[in-house]
From Swiss-Prot:
Organism: Wigglesworthia glossinidia brevipalpis
Cellular compartments per GO CC: cytosol
Function: Catalyzes the conversion of 4-hydroxy-tetrahydrodipicolinate (HTPA) to tetrahydrodipicolinate.
Pathway(s) per entry: Amino-acid biosynthesis; L-lysine biosynthesis via DAP pathway; (S)-tetrahydrodipicolinate from L-aspartate: step 4/4
Record key words, sorted: Amino-acid biosynthesis, Cytoplasm, Diaminopimelate biosynthesis, Lysine biosynthesis, NAD, NADP, Oxidoreductase
Name this protein carries in UniProt: 4-hydroxy-tetrahydrodipicolinate reductase
Disulfide bonds: none
């Protein structure tokens, strides 16, 4: 649904306030004028309940305190930004569905049935779901639509190597699975694409696609140097949802709009 009205301030709530992404979104949101970070959630009976989220994110106090029950903050937010676990994310989604709240989902690891559920719920509320909120990674997805045609060459091997911190639970990463799907979708011949996963240290995220020929190879690599890129993407997603009532959206919608704006200028 199109809406050309000027976007006013958007009230966001976040989940996992004491987690890596929760803290990063707090640090990032304070510098974006359209965003009002009104509330943030932690796990039920968490020791981090009633913490100032600014202090929790290692910045200055901002007067917003954590809560462990989404029902208590229902009237305080327009869009929920969630980077937690599959179980928690589905619980938050169910609440948003029942209370007609918009939701940005950054959690990964959903199975096919859960993805169908997200799509079904988007008929009633606006949902923005992406396996990766980095603009660079999403540009790679687009590049692969063209470059993957080289996979039709007879003697070629295609490999994907993904590296993440040792606490990341889903193996392989949702991004690497999406990369594989994007390549296979554009191939005219069947190809076995291998994904190798590394979980080590505090690596934020690295994805490498290798096209190996006889005597040469092509590599495409995306490296995330900090979590701010994901936080910015998620906040832009919340802004995107601000004038949407229903529908399922992803980063390609934002990239398409940016491309149109670039052409018109």
């Amino acid at each position: 649904m199109k809406n050309n009205k000027k976007i006013s301030s958007i009230r966001i709530a976040t989940t996992g306030a004491n987690g890596k992404m929760g803290k990063q979104i707090t640090r990032t949101a304070i510098n974006i004028s359209k965003i009002i970070h009104t509330s943030s959630l932690v796990r039920h009976k968490s020791s981090f309940k009633n913490y100032d989220i600014g202090k929790l994110a290692n910045i200055f106090p901002i007067g917003v305190f954590t809560n462990d029950n989404i029902k208590d903050i229902s009237d305080k937010f327009d869009v929920l930004i969630d980077f937690t676990s599959v179980k928690s994310s589905l619980e938050y989604l169910n609440f948003c569905y029942k209370n007609k709240k918009k939701m940005v989902i950054g959690t990964t690891g959903f199975n096919a049935m859960q993805n169908k559920l997200i799509k079904h719920m988007s008929k009633k509320i606006a949902i923005f779901y992406s396996e990766n909120f980095s603009f660079g990674a999403n540009i790679i997805f687009r590049l692969l639509k063209n470059i993957s045609s080289i996979g039709n060459i007879k003697n070629i091997d295609i490999d994907i190597i993904e590296c993440h911190h040792k606490e990341k639970s889903d193996i392989p990463s949702a991004t690497s699975i999406l990369i594989k799907k994007n390549i296979l979708k554009n191939l005219k011949i069947k190809k076995n694409i291998k994904i190798s996963s590394i979980r080590s240290g505090n690596i934020i995220g690295e994805h490498k696609i290798i096209f190996s020929f006889l005597g040469e190879k092509i590599e495409i690599t995306h490296q995330a140097y900090n979590r701010k890129i994901f936080a910015l993407g998620a906040i832009k997603a919340a802004i995107w949802l601000s004038n949407k009532k229903t529908g399922l959206f992803n980063m390609s919608h934002i990239l398409n709009k940016q491309a149109k704006n670039f052409k018109s200028n």
